Amino acid sequence: MSRQWMTLMAILLVYIPVAIDATVLHVAAPTLSVALGSSGNELLWIIDIYSLVMAGMVLPMGALGDKIGFKRLLLLGSAIFGIASLCAALSPTAMTLIASRALLAVGAAMIVPATLAGIRSTFAEASQRNMALGLWAAVGSGGAAFGPLVGGILLEHFYWGSVFLINVPIVLVVIAINAKVVPRQPARREQPLNLLQALVLIAAILMLVFSAKSALKGQLALWLTALVALGGAAMLTWFIRKQLSAARPMVDMRLFTHRIILSGVMMAISQALW
């Protein structure tokens, strides 16, 4: 096997637990409710915080990868992912589990752009790169699909923390393999990080989701829910305007005028909702 395909296998190995963790808790709600005494709202945050934080952190982590090199980003993200998995497995309360899942998402947000950058730099030929990207997408979809199955099997035979604890040995093996196999990419120190904009985006997403959950459950006064929603919308508007005016934005908003990209985004949103 050529070094290119060995590199791809190493990259895909670290991506598998990232994909599985997006859905592994979908069957764990009753178990978590009993084990941690968590409320319905806390259960929703335990499940959703991973995707929400990851969505806001992927873009700045891609910029961080440009600054430090994507191999370093991959190894750092894997280490954070493993530590967060251990913290999640040992969480004594719902709030500590939510915090651990948020940290888990930070590690995942480092891994995702690092794997894509690794594929792009490893495969110079377009046909091979397209095949590698197809395998990457298949691993992501397959991991998310198998997440509930993996979670169900582990919960049936072990305690609830095993759905996170299983990540630790996988991450240790993956770090060792990637440190040896994945080639080092050159860093671009001039790439802006825009951490403030990333934090604003995360805050906007969390505020909008929190207001939607609160409105459905009626836990807050209507005026307070509306205020949180308006705050989130204002932050999101500020973020979009910053991207439109920046010389080197984190997101090129003009991409959303492309029909293929826009239709893909809409399909992804529809799939996530249903």
Language-model regions, residue ranges each:
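Extracytoplasmic
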Residues: R3-S51, G56, I111-V112, L116
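Hydrophobic alpha-helix/TM-entry signal in multi-pass membrane transporters
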Residues: Q4-I11, L74, F81, L97, ...
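12-transmembrane solute porter fold
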Residues: Q4-I20, L25-V27, G40, L222-G231, ...
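Small-residue-mediated transmembrane helix hinge/kink sites in multi-pass secondary transporters
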Residues: P30, G62-A63, L116, G151-G152, ...
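Short hydrophobic/small-residue motifs within alpha-helical transmembrane segments
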Residues: S51-L52, S141-G142, A268
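Helix-loop-helix hairpins in multi-pass membrane proteins, especially solute transporters
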Residues: D66, F70-L196
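A membrane-interface helix-boundary motif in multi-pass transporters
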Residues: E156-V168, A212-T225
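C-terminal membrane-cytosol helix-exit motif in multi-pass small-molecule transporters
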Residues: V168-A187, I202-S214, L230-A246
